[in-house]
């Protein structure tokens, strides 16, 4: 019979735990790196890459930065638009839901299809809502600029555009329709 010390038992138990923690840190850093590179490059394609492809892409990008031969970086100085950030987050969440459902034993295929089609419909509705909101805002801005340019300035006005601005009405969902929020 082989004698094992408390230290050996502790190491046997602790080693897998430490390995899981190390992998969790690596995955967290990879996700952070992925979003940072996507922000700097202005390319959302990297968000859909697997870990190895993303690391290779990050290495190529860093080499380009080091040598000064940076290929076109369209949005390097400007932060991503809130809508783009939301889209990326939503798609990452949908991918995570899909992954979890696929790895859950006993998960009904019909339930998975139902959830994924629901998420797709919601995403499509959100895009349509945003497009309608953008259109109404641009029409209101055009109408406002026409009204402001044609209105005579009074002696009390400063002559700035903000003097004639009125608050633009924000589109509200219908009474029966609830506005979806990701939180």
Swiss-Prot record:
It is found in: Nucleus. Participates in the control of cell fate choice by uncommitted neuroectodermal cells in the embryo. Transcriptional repressor. Binds DNA on N-box motifs: 5'-CACNAG-3'. Residues 86-119 form the Orange domain. Keywords: Developmental protein, Differentiation, DNA-binding, Neurogenesis, Nucleus, Repressor, Transcription, Transcription regulation. The gene is E(spl)m8-HLH. GO terms for cellular component: nucleus. Transcription repression requires formation of a complex with a corepressor protein (Groucho). Forms homodimers. Its main location: nucleus. The keyword DNA-binding applies. The keyword DNA-binding applies. InterPro entries: bHLH_dom, HES_HEY, HLH_DNA-bd_sf, Orange_dom. Residues 10-65 form the bHLH domain. This is Enhancer of split m8 protein. One of its GO terms (biological process) is nervous system development. Pfam families: Hairy_orange (PF07527), HLH (PF00010). Gene3D superfamilies: Helix-loop-helix DNA-binding domain. Residues 152-183 are annotated as: Disordered. GO terms for molecular function: DNA binding; protein dimerization activity. A motif (WRPW motif) lies at residues 180-183. The orange domain and the basic helix-loop-helix motif mediate repression of specific transcriptional activators, such as basic helix-loop-helix protein dimers. The C-terminal WRPW motif is a transcriptional repression domain necessary for the interaction with Groucho, a transcriptional corepressor recruited to specific target DNA by Hairy-related proteins.
């Amino acid at each position: 019979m082989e004698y094992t010390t408390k230290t050996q038992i502790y190491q046997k138990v602790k080693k897998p735990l430490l390995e899981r923690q190390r992998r969790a840190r690596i995955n967290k850093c990879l996700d952070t790196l992925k979003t940072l590179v996507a922000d700097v490059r202005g390319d959302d394609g990297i968000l859909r890459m697997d870990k190895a492809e993303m690391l290779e892409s990050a290495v190529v990008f860093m080499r380009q930065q080091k040598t000064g031969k940076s290929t076109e970086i369209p949005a390097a100085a400007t932060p991503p638009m809130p809508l783009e950030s939301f889209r990326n987050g939503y798609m990452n969440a949908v991918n995570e839901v899909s992954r979890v459902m696929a790895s859950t034993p006993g998960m009904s295929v019909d339930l998975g299809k139902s959830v994924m089609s629901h998420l797709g419909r919601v995403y499509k509705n959100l895009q349509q809502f945003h497009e309608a909101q953008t259109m109404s805002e641009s029409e209101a801005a055009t109408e406002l600029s026409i009204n402001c340019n044609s209105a005579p300035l009074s002696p009390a006005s400063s002559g700035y555009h903000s003097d004639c601005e009125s608050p633009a009405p924000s589109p509200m969902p219908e009474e029966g329709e609830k506005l979806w929020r990701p939180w």
